[in-house]
Regions:
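Thiol-/selenol-based redox modules, centered on thioredoxin-like
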Residues: 103-166
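Structural microenvironment flanking redox-active thiols in thiol-disulfide oxidoreductases
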Residues: 37-91
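Residue-level structural signal for beta-strand termini and adjacent loop
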Residues: 19-20, 95, 131
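Short, ordered coil/turn segments that flank beta-strands lining enzyme active or ligand-binding pockets
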Residues: 10-13, 121
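Loop/turn elements at helix/coil->beta-strand transitions in domains of secreted/extracellular proteins
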Residues: 22-26, 52-56, 77-79, 121-124
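Short active-site neighborhood of thiol/selenol oxidoreductases, capturing the structured segment around
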Residues: 15-43, 57-60
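Short, surface-exposed loop/helix-turn segments at secondary-structure junctions
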Residues: 93-105
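N-proximal helix/coil linker or "cap" segments that precede and/or mark the start of modular domains
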Residues: 1-6, 21-22
Length: 166
């Protein structure tokens, strides 16, 4: 099971990862600033197309940003930008940059500046995109929405995952 997390966002929303289970898919966007500026603009533009597929978007800064800079980034974003809990979320999900056969895909100790994770409506992590290693695939929004549409056609085969406990 993937690590659950709590968050508070710039728009006043708050919750946990588990809140999305049984309701909608989630595109979790871990970003660095200003490195992810272009991608965040793409997501801002495509947010209506993504959310109409039953998918929420949460943007998570991978480092602690000054409050005024975070406010500037979040201004005009049609989806929540996490203001509290980002560093912990980022640290936990950075572990998913690896595979079993290659523990550090991009070199030992390398941390990526941008990663995206797609969770299905049942709470399972279904896809990961790291632009540096996976190429430009999800920059094509029609491909991303097509993959989400395919997820939406799947029926539940397992109950929601349990809590992730260490």
């Amino acid at each position: 099971a993937t690590p659950n997390f709590s968050y508070t966002a710039h728009d006043g929303s708050s919750g946990t990862l588990k809140d999305f289970r049984g309701k909608q898919n989630l595109l979790l966007v871990l970003f660095s600033w200003p490195e992810s500026r272009v991608r965040l603009d793409q997501l801002r533009t495509a947010s209506t197309a993504i959310t109409t597929t039953g998918t929420a978007i949460l943007a998570v800064p991978m480092t602690d940003l000054p409050p005024d800079e975070l406010t500037s980034i979040a201004q005009g974003m049609p989806f929540p930008v996490i203001t509290q809990g980002g560093r912990e979320i980022s640290r936990s999900y950075a572990l998913f940059r690896r595979t079993l056969s290659i523990p550090d895909l991009f070199g030992e100790g390398t941390r990526q500046s941008h990663m995206e994770f797609l969770f299905d409506r049942f709470g399972y992590l279904r896809a990961r995109w790291i632009p540096h290693g996976d190429g430009p695939s999800w920059t094509d929004m029609s491909l991303l929405t097509q993959q989400i549409t395919q997820l939406n056609q799947e029926r539940e085969i397992l109950p929601p995952p349990g809590d992730h406990v260490h």
